């Protein structure tokens, strides 16, 4: 079965892709009648060397993404994974020659079709009197024994574009550029690994891998690698790759040693997530520095892909200061990353976090009667939530991911562990603030954030007073914060429904002579009734709002949990 691709037609996909790049980049132009993209300011290159590269499409952003001042002059593209036509290569050479350039360097990846077609175009151009040189780049470090065809051209070719581009921009001559980039090419290596294959538009995947296998040492055309290995962690795979690339018994190894300075390139082969790319980059930095290698520059991104292949390649280039200046030279190429000219190794990568604000001393003695009462309340709340874990999870399965009970139990266990460390603060404001921090760190999910918001806001009115009116104001402040940031309102089938109903009853605490337990009892009953009523509501906020109301036949688990917490508080205060 062929894979799905967002194309207009299989036959025209390479042309459409190149046209799209040029349409969105005013620095590029198409060469009419050919699958060629050129700098739009060719006239500015008079008296300088032009740089042309290319190959099959499907490796984007290579190579057209690297056209620009300080990199390539133009690119000739073939169909997907197919070498470009000789006629188009020759047309590109003629176009840059007519613009007044003093010679053209062809930068070619080491594949038979590319060598033949670029080589033939070069000979035809030279027969016309156009000075043309060609460098063939092979940076593949997969094969331990060199084959007659030589090393394949991989992502390291992009570094050659950069070095050659900087030299050309500086006015260096054609033969000297060719000489220097040939030296640079011998100081680098690339190795790829993939979780699965890719598929050319209109075709099936090029190879199959089982679920527990990855392909090591594969090329950029979907061809199989040198061996298959068992799936492992990112750290383990990176170590294996670097071991292979630097093993001196490997005929295509990179001669990296402790003390070596390198440019490190982590390349997405097309289908890897940015999350995985970051993990691989971190693993590569740690592994190289653990070997005593200095990372002068780190390039992480998609440079040379293989369509949608979910894999990466690692490239190492040995550098000295003169070569590093060429890597750092300015370029306008759209796909080249804007990397700071600063060494990665030796750089301070973290800063000390700001200290927590100093708390005022607890106004009531820790371990006193008020503190003990606080501990009893918290213990009852925790045991209540732990007892409700499975019930809340069952309620949550209808509208969420079935973890509401687990989330509340995680909070309960965190509070229990905290209580083992010593008596809680007797100051209500300090207690709520500490609980807020604890729940934000340990509870997780939206519930942790909402309870954290509620408690942080509720603590503020209690800093100056702890009277019943202050507690009512604390409830108001907590509810306001939940509504402001959670975007829920009463009637939206959330925990706010229970808390809001209780908050309305607690307004009575603001009246002179109000009785704590009488008012709180009414508040708890209202919260429980509101929680039960949520089963008849259509969700207006949270994950449940994306679920059909026909499936919401049970009370909202968050509302049930909030009412249960209030009931637990009341029971302790009544005892």
Swiss-Prot record:
Where do the DhaK domain residues begin and end?
Answer: 9-336
Q: Which residues does the record give as dihydroxyacetone binding sites? A: 56-59, 109, 114
Cofactor(s) it depends on:
Mg(2+); Mn(2+); Co(2+)
Indicate the segments forming the DhaL domain, all copies.
Answer: 372-571
Q: How is activity modulated by pH?
A: Optimum pH is 6.6.
Annotated segments matching region Disordered: 348-367
Q: Name one GO molecular function term.
A: triokinase activity
Cofactor binding description: Manganese or cobalt are requested for FAD-AMP lyase activity.
Q: Name one Pfam family in it.
A: Dak2
Where do the annotations place ATP binding? 401-404, 446-447, 486, 494-495, 556-558
Q: Which residues form the active site?
A: 221
Question: Could you state one GO biological process linked to this protein?
Answer: glycerol catabolic process
Please tell me the disease that this Swiss-Prot or TrEMBL record associates with the protein: Triokinase and FMN cyclase deficiency syndrome: An autosomal recessive disease characterized by cataracts and developmental delay that may be associated with cerebellar hypoplasia. Additional features may include liver dysfunction, microcytic anemia, and fatal cardiomyopathy with lactic acidosis following a febrile illness.
Q: Which NCBIfam families match?
A: dak_ATP (TIGR02361), PRK14479.1 (NF011049)
Identify its protein family. Answer: Belongs to the dihydroxyacetone kinase (DAK) family.
Assembly and partners are described as: Homodimer. Interacts with IFIH1 (via the CARD domains), the interaction is inhibited by viral infection.
Q: What is this protein called?
A: Triokinase/FMN cyclase
- Annotated source species: Homo sapiens
């Amino acid at each position: 079965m062929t894979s799905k691709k967002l194309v207009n037609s299989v036959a025209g996909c390479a042309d459409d892709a190149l046209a799209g790049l040029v349409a969105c980049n005013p620095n590029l132009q198409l060469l009419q009648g050919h699958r060629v993209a050129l700098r739009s300011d060719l006239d500015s290159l008079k008296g300088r060397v032009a740089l042309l590269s290319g190959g099959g499409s499907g490796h984007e952003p290579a190579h057209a993404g690297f056209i620009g001042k300080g990199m390539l002059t133009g690119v000739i593209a073939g169909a997907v994974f197919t070498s470009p036509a000789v006629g188009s290569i020759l047309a590109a050479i003629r176009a840059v020659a007519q613009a007044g350039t003093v010679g053209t360097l062809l930068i070619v990846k080491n594949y038979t079709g590319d060598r033949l077609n670029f080589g033939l175009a070069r000979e035809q151009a030279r027969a016309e009197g156009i000075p043309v040189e060609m460098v063939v780049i092979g940076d593949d470090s997969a094969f331990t024994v060199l084959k007659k065809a030589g090393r394949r051209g991989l992502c390291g070719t992009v570094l050659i574009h950069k070095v050659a581009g900087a030299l050309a921009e500086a006015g260096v001559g054609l033969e000297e550029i060719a000489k220097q980039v040939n030296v640079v090419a011998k100081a680098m290596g690339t190795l790829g690994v993939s979780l699965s294959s890719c598929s050319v538009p209109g075709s099936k995947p090029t190879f199959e891998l089982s679920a527990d296998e990855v392909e090591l040492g594969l090329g950029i055309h979907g061809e199989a690698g040198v061996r298959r290995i068992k799936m492992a962690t990112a750290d383990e795979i990176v170590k294996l790759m670097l071991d292979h690339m630097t093993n001196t018994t490997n005929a295509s190894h990179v001669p990296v040693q402790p003390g070596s300075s390198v440019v490190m390139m982590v390349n997405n082969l097309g289908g890897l997530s940015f999350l995985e790319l970051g993990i691989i980059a971190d693993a590569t930095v740690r592994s190289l520095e653990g070997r005593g290698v200095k990372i002068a520059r780190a390039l992480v991104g998609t440079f040379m892909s293989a369509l949608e292949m979910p894999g990466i390649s690692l490239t190492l280039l040995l550098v000295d200061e003169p070569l590093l200046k060429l890597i750092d030279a300015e370029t306008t190429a759209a796909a080249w990353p804007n990397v700071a000219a600063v060494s990665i190794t030796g750089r301070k990568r973290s800063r000390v976090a700001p200290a927590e604000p100093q708390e005022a001393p607890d106004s009531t003695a820790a371990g006193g009667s008020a503190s003990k009462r606080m501990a009893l309340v918290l213990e009852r709340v925790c045991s209540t939530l732990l007892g409700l874990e499975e019930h809340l999870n069952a309620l949550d399965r209808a509208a969420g991911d079935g973890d509401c009970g687990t989330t509340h139990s995680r909070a309960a266990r965190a509070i229990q562990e905290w209580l083992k460390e010593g008596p809680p603060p007797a100051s209500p404001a300090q207690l709520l603030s500490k609980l807020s921090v604890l729940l934000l760190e340990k509870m997780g999910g939206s519930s942790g954030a909402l309870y954290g918001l509620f408690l942080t806001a509720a603590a503020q009115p209690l800093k100056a007073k702890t009277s019943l009116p202050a507690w009512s104001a604390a409830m108001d402040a907590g509810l306001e914060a939940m509504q402001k940031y959670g975007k829920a309102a009463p009637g939206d089938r959330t925990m706010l429904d229970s808390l809001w109903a209780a908050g309305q009853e607690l307004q009575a605490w603001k009246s002179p002579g109000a009785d704590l337990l009488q008012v709180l009892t009414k508040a708890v009953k209202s919260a429980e009734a509101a929680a039960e009523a949520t089963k008849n509501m259509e969700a207006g906020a949270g994950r449940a709002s994306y679920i059909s109301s026909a499936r919401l036949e049970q009370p909202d688990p968050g509302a049930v949990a909030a009412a249960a917490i209030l009931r637990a508080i009341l029971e302790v205060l009544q005892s």
